[in-house]
Amino acid sequence: MSDEPDSPPLPPEAEAFLRHLAEQKRYSARTVRNYRQALERFTAWLRGQPGSLHPLMVSSRHVRRYLMELQTVYERRTSNLHLSALRSFYRYQLRLGKIEASPLAGISGPKLEKKLPKFLTEKQIALLLAGPKRLLENEAIEPFTALRDRLVMELLYGGGFRVSELSDLNYGTFDEQSGVARIRGKGGKERLCPVGEVALECLKMFRAQFARHSGPQDPVLITEQGRRLSVRRIQLMLKRYLDLADLPHDLTPHKIRHSYATHLLDNGADLRLVQELLGHASLSTTQIYTHVSVARLKDMHRRAHPRA
């Protein structure tokens, strides 16, 4: 979020809320940072109002005025992110009994145009997964890197992980007999993720060759020095293989998660099962992937039917 005013110190209630998100809800560092920026901007705005308002003293009238100002500065999506942070903050204060009602009650953000998620076709996924082997055969990478990079992509596609969840994987997370990982995702919610036979065999092979003495608390994905592979390293690694497969550079690890969900639905998986696998709190979040599948069916019909 750019062009922010100078950030005043946040009131204790806001700092406690951010700690709650990080420590209890287990939100990602990026989400907590975005919430902090939203609260800092709102606090700065309140201090510029007559009487230098405290966040716990505002009314819905103040919030509406603030939202109008946000919409003159930011795109709709960013305005909604700010609004979401404030809504969560006041919901927390309400639960603690610090306020009697949320000033955001009845206030909705600007409507967004729904965009279908980008995803890779099954053929494109196969090209992507073949990348490490190609580089190894050309002696462009070492065997460790080739198998580790293949494992990263097999797990991303086989388990539908968020990239932060993938980076956090430890050997104790996996039941190697069943091929199921126990994941703690957004908001600290736990879910079970089957990764598939191919990813599981790749994991066993990597462990046998390069991590034989690893224990339950040791990271699955590591650097050449044995340190945990960071989210940033995973993102950069994927860009390398996208380039190798001549695929668009704007595809991210999260787009592989989109591909995972879309391919499950294309092949007949139940929508609620996919919701559980992805760890979505709401079915409506998962339903966007049905729109992708319907769009593909319509496109196939248009191209194949003589009267389409």
Can you name each region flagged by the protein language model?
Residues 1-308:
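Conserved catalytic core of the tyrosine transesterase superfamily
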